Amino acid sequence: MRATTRAVIVVAFVCCLSAVAIVVFRQSRSKPLAEGAGIEFPAAVSQATKVQLLKDDFRIITNVSVLPTPVLKAFQEKGGSRSLLANPGAKFNPSDVIWDASVPRKRLIFAGASTDRCFVHYEQGGRGRSYVIEVFGLRSGETMEPLWRGHCTRPADNLETLRSQITGGGCF
């Protein structure tokens, strides 16, 4: 009887330790995302400039990790390496109710890079889902310059649709 009692106590102890380890592991994996670096975009950009910004031949990007390095860093948490931008189709927080603070509130629709510019078109969760375009000038391998940040009335499926939206005033 005594051996059985000891076995039960040992099993219970191991189960408790396992439960604690699982909780600690899950909490470490679901650490809330920190804020990103504050990016200052120009206050006003003319319609002609907005149209001109997307005139280049852009290589389309559908994976966040393929963004040019300085732009990728702009979409990472400050002081960390986790992305604040989810890949297309990946889990993200689409509303103002945050169920998992470790999941980004922004999700890439698509991006594009040319020799001297990069744009990122993404959806952002909140009180209402919004569709954003951010355009950056690429100065070297490690620096970028924010050129324009706009809100679009709807998401674009491809670069031509995005260009049409901008030309027609659908991104302001």
Which ranges hold each PLM region?
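N-terminal secretory signal peptides that target proteins for export/translocation
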Residues: 1-3
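Flexible low-complexity loop/turn motifs enriched in small/helix-breaking residues
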Residues: 5-10, 21-117, 149-172
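Bacterial N-terminal signal peptides
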Residues: 12-17
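Short beta-strand elements that form the blades of beta-propeller/WD-repeat-like
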Residues: 117-123
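Solvent-exposed loop/turn segments at secondary-structure junctions
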Residues: 124-127, 152-154
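Structural motif
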Residues: 128-134
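Residue-level detector of beta-propeller blades
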Residues: 132, 145-148
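Short loop/turn segments immediately following beta-strands, especially the blade-tip
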Residues: 138-143
